[in-house]
Amino acid sequence: MSDYLVKSIDKTKNLRLLTITAKDVVGEAQKRHDLWSASAAVLGRTLVGSLLLAGAELTDKEELTVRLLGNGPVGPTIVTAMSDLKVKGYVKNPHIALSPKKNGHIDVKKAVGQGMLEVTKDLGLKEPYTGQVPIVSGEIAEDFAYYLTKSEQIPSAVGLSVFVNPNNSIGEAGGFMLQALPGASDALITETIKRIKALPALSTEFLDGMTPEDLARKILGTDCKILEKDDVAFSCDCSKEKYAGILETLKSSQLKAMINEDHGAELTCNFCGNKYHYTENELKDILAKKKEEKDY
């Protein structure tokens, strides 16, 4: 089953729901960054949550960046999602595995630690907008919900799931984001939350073949309306040309050292792990572009 996101609405048109399956997205991140179990769970949940947030809020060529800045062993987690539902991300420490909790689950809360959750949205305005809330749970889903409720005043419920196999590959990944629209009654919200609490573990459901459409009907009822279905993917827009532009910003003395001492340079993209090698001659060409500039 390919990765995709579904948007739906309940029969009263007062509850909006986004549901997603993202096994391949998280699997690609796991392979690119060689993630161990705890790191895979943290980055995976953040990737899924960021895609749900992008699906709910972005249009045109907008993008958002989620920074989960916890003091746990995984370290900061950075994810960027685009309006076309392409996502990329990384954790500072990819090789973290922790003792499981008593129920056998990965201790995501311990891996994340305490800190802040920041969401920066580039909506094509002069300045990006950043909202910030404390990490209240560390389980990540609750932290996204807290951000939406406190920073954006949108009453929300979020569920995120990543199942990591014993060999660190990804067995499943997915989740949901429920948002109450202004006309939603307390009774409607209460009834829907009861449905969510009655759900079996999302990981079990996705492993058993549940689709985003299935999850939407379980949460909103079988009479909900499916509005939209869109593919999602792990994708990075880095390139050798972009990194050459970064090299051009270095001082001439630094470029000369790379040429004369290192005889080349290799840069690695944090988001996707792609490596870009520059030969001496390529570095000389970059240095030549700077010759008309005043070097400080």
Curated annotation (Swiss-Prot):
Cysteine disulfide links: 236-238, 269-272
One Gene Ontology term, aspect cellular component: cytoplasm
Pfam families named among the record's database cross-references: HSP33 (PF01430)
Compartment(s) where it occurs, according to its Swiss-Prot or TrEMBL record: Cytoplasm
UniProt keyword terms in alphabetical order: Chaperone, Cytoplasm, Disulfide bond, Redox-active center, Stress response, Zinc
InterPro entries, A to Z: Heat_shock_Hsp33, Heat_shock_Hsp33_C, Heat_shock_Hsp33_N
A GO BP annotation: protein refolding
Superkingdom, natural source: Bacteria
Modification(s) after translation: Under oxidizing conditions two disulfide bonds are formed involving the reactive cysteines. Under reducing conditions zinc is bound to the reactive cysteines and the protein is inactive.
Molecular function terms, GO-annotated: protein folding chaperone; unfolded protein binding
Function: Redox regulated molecular chaperone. Protects both thermally unfolding and oxidatively damaged proteins from irreversible aggregation. Plays an important role in the bacterial defense system toward oxidative stress.
NCBIfam families to which the protein is assigned, alphabetical: PRK00114.1
Family affiliation: Belongs to the HSP33 family.
Protein name: 33 kDa chaperonin
Origin species: Lactobacillus helveticus (strain DPC 4571)
Gene name per UniProt: hslO
